[in-house]
């Protein structure tokens, strides 16, 4: 996962480089493969500066928490076997992603800087709002799945990937994951023009690298989850045996879509973001969820 995360930074720069038709790291070195290693070395040998007015324990704890949560989210994901086969895997993921809000909040508050605090508050509002839609969409999928275990989703989708019957939910889920991971066009927390990089503005070197790593790990995680939920994680009609290969391919394609969106769209305004989730997504997801609850009841439990 850490390796994937390191090379995702490279992939992102390559794609942005190609999209903006300029020389990115796709020129330097052997295909730019040494870039992530150079970045890591550079970030971790710098001196971690700390503002005098900041509160030290929280300042150090926040990036650590962010990164550990980003890694522990991978525990219930089946690829093809989960690390721990949790009965309530989906619930576990929801709970941990809600905890990630705290790391953002603490980092913004502990930095004792106005920019950082505004950025953190935006990030928290955004993450919490979109988590509501994510939870409701997950509920609808669990109706289709019949249990909260992520591994059973593979068996559910052997005949038909859930993205086909649930395509409105899949669209909303994808946009909500974009917002949840604070990516463009929803990267309000990092509005360069007004907030100078947002809640991690006072961080340098190691702790900053931890935030960065947490962000990219979360991106891969969300795409892996999307693959598991909608794209029949390990299933491919042509090569049903290549479990992990199928999984990785789908996740990679989704991640590239994330970067593609980033290169193509301008940033949302804050009020538009909130309008989108509370006035469009929430009513729609609720309606669809009620539909998924009531259809089996109306059709007398015919699966």
UniProtKB/Swiss-Prot annotation:
PROSITE patterns per the UniProt record, alphabetical: COMPLEX1_ND1_1, COMPLEX1_ND1_2
GO BP: any one term: aerobic respiration
Superkingdom of origin: Eukaryota
Alphabetic keyword roster: Electron transport, Membrane, Mitochondrion, Mitochondrion inner membrane, NAD, Respiratory chain, Translocase, Transmembrane, Transmembrane helix, Transport, Ubiquinone
Record has Transport as a keyword: yes
Coiled coil regions, renumbered to chain: none
One cellular component term from this protein's GO annotations in UniProt: mitochondrial inner membrane
Bilayer topology term: Multi-pass membrane protein
Entry's localization field: Mitochondrion inner membrane
EC number: 7.1.1.2
Molecular function via GO: NADH dehydrogenase (ubiquinone) activity
Sequence intervals crossing the membrane: 57-77, 88-108, 124-144, 159-179, 219-239, 241-261, 273-293
Reactions it catalyzes: a ubiquinone + NADH + 5 H(+)(in) = a ubiquinol + NAD(+) + 4 H(+)(out)
Main localization category: mitochondrion
Classification via HAMAP family: NDH1_NuoH
Similarity comment: Belongs to the complex I subunit 1 family.
Function noted in UniProt: Core subunit of the mitochondrial membrane respiratory chain NADH dehydrogenase (Complex I) that is believed to belong to the minimal assembly required for catalysis. Complex I functions in the transfer of electrons from NADH to the respiratory chain. The immediate electron acceptor for the enzyme is believed to be ubiquinone.
Name this protein carries in UniProt: NADH-ubiquinone oxidoreductase chain 1
Gene: MT-ND1
């Amino acid at each position: 996962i850490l390796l994937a995360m390191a090379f995702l930074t490279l992939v992102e720069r390559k794609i942005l480089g190609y999209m903006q038709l300029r020389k990115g790291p796709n020129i330097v070195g052997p295909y730019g493969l040494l870039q992530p290693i150079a970045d890591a070395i550079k970030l971790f040998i710098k001196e971690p500066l700390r503002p005098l007015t900041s509160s030290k324990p929280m300042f150090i704890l926040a990036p650590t928490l962010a990164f550990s949560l980003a890694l522990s989210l991978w525990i219930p994901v089946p690829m093809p076997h989960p690390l721990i086969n949790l009965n309530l895997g989906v619930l576990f993921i929801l709970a941990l992603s809600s905890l990630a809000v705290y790391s953002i909040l603490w980092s913004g508050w502990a930095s004792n800087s106005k920019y950082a605090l505004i950025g953190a508050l935006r990030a928290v509002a955004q993450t919490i709002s979109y988590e509501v839609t994510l939870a409701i969409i997950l509920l609808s999928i669990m109706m289709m799945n019949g249990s909260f275990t992520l591994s059973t989703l593979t068996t559910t989708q052997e005949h038909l990937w859930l993205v086909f019957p649930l395509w409105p939910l899949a669209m909303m889920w994808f946009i909500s994951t974009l917002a949840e991971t604070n990516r463009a066009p929803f990267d309000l927390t990092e509005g360069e023009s007004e907030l100078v990089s947002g809640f991690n503005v006072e961080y340098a070197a190691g702790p900053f690298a931890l935030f960065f790593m947490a962000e990219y790990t979360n991106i891969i995680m969300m795409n892996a989850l999307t693959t598991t939920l909608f794209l029949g994680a390990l299933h491919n009609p042509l090569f049903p045996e290549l479990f992990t290969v199928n999984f990785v391919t789908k996740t990679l394609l989704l991640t590239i879509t994330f970067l593609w969106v980033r290169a193509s769209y301008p940033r949302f305004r804050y009020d538009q973001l909130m309008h989108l989730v509370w006035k469009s997504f929430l009513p729609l997801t609720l309606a669809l969820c009620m539909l998924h609850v009531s259809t089996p009841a109306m059709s007398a439990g015919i699966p």
